[in-house]
C-alpha cells in the first residue's frame, strides 16, 4: 500500500476563507426562534477537551459517522437530522432506526479503504446544520466554529484529548452528554439502564472457567497493513466482559500495526475481525492470506469471527450489541 492509515482515526484540517464567506450571510439559529426550545439553555459540555456551548437544543443535525445514530434514535432526536454522509451499514440498526435513516438525505457514501469519509467542506456547510456528528479530515471543530456550527465526536475518535481508557461507563457518560445537549436526561437514563441490563445478561452467559485468549484485528482487504487493538480501545473491555484475555493487554495504544510474526508469537485462541463495510468473507480472507496464518490456533480451530467496526469501536451502544455477538458466537 502507498500509505498506512489507521482505521477510524481522523485528522483535522483548516477551513478555507472562501468556504466561510459562502455562509457569512447565513445565520442559522433555528432553535433560537422558539422560546420553549431555549428553556434551560445555554448548556455547556466538554468534548475532546473543548468546552462547547449550546444556546438551544440543536434542530438541524448532520451525520458524518454512524456511531451516534442509535443514541440519537433512543433520545428521540434522530428525525432532526437533515443530511448524512458516509457508511451506514443496515446491520447496525433496528427497523425503526432504519426507517428514520431512510428519511435522511444521504449526500455521499464515498469512503476509502479504511473507512474515511470523502466529502467537501462546502457540501456540509451548505446543509446549514447547527450540530455535526463526527470529525473528518477537512472539517475540524475549529473550522466549523468559524461559521457557528458545533461539532460532537465520540471520545475515542477525538483528534485531541481522546479517551485512552474507554469502557462501558464511557458509553453511559456519552449518553448523558447527549441527554444534556438535547434536554433529554430522562430518556438517556432509561436507555443507560437498558444497556446495563444487557451487559449483565451477556456476562452471565460467560463460562466460569473461561481462560481463552483473543485478539481484535482490522485487516486491509486486498493486502496491506493489519491493525490490532490494545487497551486504549473499546475492544479491550469488550473482550474482558466476554471472559477473554486480550493478547495485546500490554499495549496501551488504541490501534496499531501488527506483523504476521507478532500475531503468530501471541497466537490467540480467538480472533475477531473488524471492517467498515463490504463482504465479511473478504475480511476473513485478508486474515487467511497473511504469511503463516494457517498456523494460528484461531484459524486452525475455526475460531474467527467478523463483525462491523462500530460493534466494537468506539464506545457506543453498538459496543453492547457487539459484546452480545461475541458471547453468542464463542460461549456455550
Where are each of the predicted segments found?
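Solvent-exposed, polar/charged alpha-helical surfaces in well-ordered, non-transmembrane soluble domains
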Residues: 70-73, 122-126, 142-145, 169-176, ...
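Proline-aspartate-enriched helix->loop->beta-strand connector
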Residues: 113, 120-134, 260-273
